[in-house]
Curated annotation (Swiss-Prot):
Catalyzes the reversible conversion of 3-phosphohydroxypyruvate to phosphoserine and of 3-hydroxy-2-oxo-4-phosphonooxybutanoate to phosphohydroxythreonine. It comes from Acidithiobacillus ferrooxidans (strain ATCC 23270 / DSM 14882 / CIP 104768 / NCIMB 8455). It is an enzyme of class 2 (transferase). Homodimer. Disulfide bonds: none annotated. Its EC number is 2.6.1.52. One of its GO terms (biological process) is pyridoxine biosynthetic process. Pyridoxal 5'-phosphate binds at residues 77-78, 103, 153, 173, 196, 238-239. The modification N6-(pyridoxal phosphate)lysine is found at residue 197. One of its GO terms (cellular component) is cytoplasm. Pathway: Amino-acid biosynthesis; L-serine biosynthesis; L-serine from 3-phospho-D-glycerate: step 2/3; Cofactor biosynthesis; pyridoxine 5'-phosphate biosynthesis; pyridoxine 5'-phosphate from D-erythrose 4-phosphate: step 3/5. Binds 1 pyridoxal phosphate per subunit. L-glutamate binds at residue 43. This is Phosphoserine aminotransferase.
Length: 362
C-alpha cells in the first residue's frame, strides 16, 4: 500500500512505527538467540531480561516510588473492575466511585457484585459532559477507596485534576491516558490500565499498586485474582503475555528516547488542540459536547450537524488515509483517538479534512 494510513482506532490502537519495525526485524531471531520472543520460555534468561527491562523503564518513565509494585496481568481493565474490590475492601463495608461515563458505570456495576457502592459524584446531570469538582463530591470517611476513570474513552471526558483524599486510597482506571503526561503515582493507591491503547498490544494489563494494599484479599479469593500472588512471584505465577510485554517494553524505550512524558505531554496537547480548533471553528457543522476543561486529549468524539452525512464523511476520510473514525456504537457520530503513537502529521491531515469537508457540505 503506497498511501500512508492513519489509524484513529480507540483500541487496539496505533503503535509507534519504529516499534513495529523493530518487532519485524527481531521477529524470527531475538538478539541472536535463534528464537522469536513468542517462542521463549517465560522463565528463561532471555525473557526474564525483557521483562526486567520493561518494568524498570516503566518505573523510570512514571518515577514510580519503591513502595509500589508493578504487575503484568491479563484480563483487561474489565477484569480489574472485579479485582479492585476483591483486593482492596480490607474489611470496609463500602467503596466509593465517581461516575463520569460508560466505563465508570461498568466498573460500578461490577463492584456491586462484591460490596456496597457509594456514588461519590456523577456527571449525569449534564449528560456526562464534565468531571465534577472534588468540592462537590460526597465521600464517606469509612469508605475502602475512591475509584475514578481518569479518561472516558467513549465520552471523551478527562480528569483535569488528581483528587486529594487524605488517607483514603485513590484508584484510577488509566487505560486510555496512561503515559500521556507525567503523573504523580504517589497520589494513588492503585492504577490499572489495559495495554491496547497507549502501552502496546491487547492481552496485557498493567497494575501499579502500593505495597500496603497487598495481601488483603479474602481467604477464598481465587489465586489468579489476588494481587499479592502476582507481586510475590513477580507476575510469573503462570505464563504471562510474553509477546505483549516485549512490545510494551519497546514502547517504553521509545517514550524515553522521545524525551519522556513531559515531551509526550507537549505533543499530545498540540495534537488535541489541532482537532478541537477545527471543530470549534466550524460554526456548528461539528460539535463536541464536553466542557472545555475536561475535553480528552486522547479521545475526541464529535458529531456532524446532519447525521445523514456521516457515511460521506467516513468515505472521504478513507480516501485521505484516515481510518477507524466511526464513533462507538453506543453513542454514534465520530471519534478520533489520538494516543501517544498517533503522529502529529496524521492529526493535521484530519484537521485539514474536517475543514475541507465542512466547506464543501456546510
Amino acid at each position: 500500500m503506497n498511501q500512508t494510513i492513519f489509524n484513529f482506532s480507540a483500541g487496539p490502537a496505533v503503535l509507534p512505527h519504529v516499534v513495529l519495525e523493530q518487532v519485524q526485524a527481531e521477529l524470527l531471531d531475538w538478539h541472536g538467540s535463534g528464537m522469536s520472543v513468542m517462542e521463549m520460555s517465560h522463565r528463561g534468561p532471555e525473557f526474564m531480561k525483557i521483562a526486567a527491562e520493561a518494568e524498570q523503564d516503566l518505573r523510570d518513565l512514571l518515577d514510580i516510588p519503591a513502595n509500589y509494585k508493578i504487575l503484568f496481568l491479563q484480563g483487561g481493565a474489565t477484569l480489574q473492575f472485579a479485582m479492585v474490590p476483591l483486593n482492596l475492601m480490607r474489611g470496609h463495608g463500602k467503596a466509593s466511585y465517581v461516575q463520569t461515563g460508560i466505563w465508570s458505570k461498568k466498573a460500578i456495576a461490577e463492584a456491586r457484585r462484591f460490596t456496597a457502592v457509594e456514588i461519590a459524584a456523577s456527571n449525569e446531570d449534564r449528560h456526562a459532559s464534565y468531571v465534577p469538582m472534588q468540592a462537590d463530591w460526597q465521600v464517606s470517611p469509612d469508605t475502602a477507596y475512591v475509584h475514578i476513570t481518569g479518561n472516558e474513552t467513549i465520552g471523551g471526558v478527562e480528569f483535569d485534576f488528581i483528587p486529594d483524599l487524605g488517607d483514603i486510597p485513590l484508584v484510577s482506571d488509566a487505560s486510555s491516558h496512561i503515559l500521556s503526561k507525567p503523573t504523580d503515582v504517589s497520589r494513588f493507591g492503585l492504577i490499572y490500565a489495559g495495554a491496547q491503547k497507549n502501552i502496546g498490544p491487547a492481552g496485557l494489563t498493567l497494575v501499579i499498586v502500593r505495597d500496603d494494599l497487598l495481601g488483603h484479599a479474602p481467604a477464598n479469593t481465587a489465586t489468579m485474582l489476588d494481587y499479592a500472588v502476582y507481586a510475590k512471584e513477580e507476575s510469573m505465577h503462570n505464563t504471562p503475555p510474553t509477546f505483549a510485554i516485549y512490545v510494551a517494553g519497546l514502547v517504553f524505550k521509545w517514550l524515553k528516547q522521545l524525551g519522556g512524558l513531559e515531551r509526550m505531554a507537549e505533543i499530545n496537547a498540540r495534537k488535541a488542540r489541532l482537532l478541537y480548533d477545527a471543530i470549534d471553528e466550524s460554526r456548528g457543522f461539528y460539535a463536541n459536547p464536553v466542557e472545555t476543561r475536561n475535553r480528552s486529549r486522547m479521545n475526541v468524539p464529535f458529531t456532524l450537524a446532519d447525521a445523514a452525512m456521516d457515511e460521506a464523511f467516513l468515505k472521504g476520510a478513507r480516501s485521505h488515509g484516515l481510518i477507524q473514525l466511526k464513533g462507538h456504537r453506543s453513542v454514534g457520530g465520530m471519534r478520533a483517538s489520538i494516543y501517544n503513537a498517533m503522529p502529529e502529521a496524521g492529526v493535521q491531515i484530519l484537521a485539514d479534512y474536517l475543514r475541507d469537508f465542512a466547506r464543501q457540505h456546510g
